[in-house]
């Protein structure tokens, strides 16, 4: 079952978010700490008119979510850029024992519906270059690489 998060879901979202950050930390400990977003952040995203946690449940258990937000490009005021209104997926997480069962695709489909209802033009997300399973998943559900972010340590 799919639904939007309510304030009563904060604790479960926090637990899933902690699991996500443990995985992200294992992939890039130079970027991520193995701790979740603060509960106040989760609350603010639930209460915001521009964002939602899309929840997927199995037998009334939250098994995954996608955090999506409506965004306007900061470059819209510059003539050299095409105006851009889009959805951004901050996070998409499914519990390990529920992966490869279609829940991730269901979340992407619902996020797409969410964005279309707001007349947004695209959905963006970030994925670590060494998160091969996530990259393969996003490729399967239609995401394409369109920009590469580079970093040089000094």
Residue ranges and their predicted role:
Residues 108, 115-126:
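Conserved GNAT acetyl-CoA-binding A-motif
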Residues 55, 61-70, 88, 93:
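Conserved beta-strand in the GNAT
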Residues 110, 125-134, 151-154:
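Conserved beta-strand-loop-alpha-helix junction that forms the acyl-donor binding cleft
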Residues 98, 102-110:
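Conserved acetyl-CoA pyrophosphate-binding loop and the N-cap/start of the following alpha-helix
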Residues 138, 143:
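Conserved active-site tyrosine of GNAT-family acetyltransferases
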Residues 43-55, 88:
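A short helix-loop-beta-strand connector motif used in the catalytic cores of GNAT acetyltransferases and
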